[in-house]
């Protein structure tokens, strides 16, 4: 019922009546294929998975009349669902591990007897507020160097690991490594601070930074930092 659009005619005249009837398939299939919007962040990182995302398939653009649910597998594909040949509306109900929920509502035209595929992507969760290191004099606990010493030029080695670890089970090799140095910066009230952070202005050497939306970010994982070169006089 509902899978076919049916109709017919009855012809009457002299003698026997004739009937002509027809049935036209009125359903098609909908499916979804999902990817990461930033594979440089997610590839090889077990904190991210495109499996388990759920999407609702709706008859109306306000998404109040749900027809079916689609769930992604480890390759980002879903099974097909049969729906009436028409435009359906699809939105994400729950995001997979490590991703933000996509709040967009997508339309998909389904034709009778055919399979329509919606291609979508999710944005990985990242830390976009980067950590800042402030260098101070240990004895005075202030950001003023003593004598002819300097707090600028201290070098810190940052190591990022694509996974959640503690100090006892860190892998032997980091996924990416960076070396940065402290730079003197003066704030609005005239106070000078000696700062290092993961940005090109502070970078001495190392891998490229992870980028998203034009900014350096950190993917989900573990970060360690260690001072590997003291500034002059320390």
Where are these regions (language model features)?
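Solvent-exposed loop/turn and edge beta-strand elements of beta-rich ligand-binding domains
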Residues: 1-234
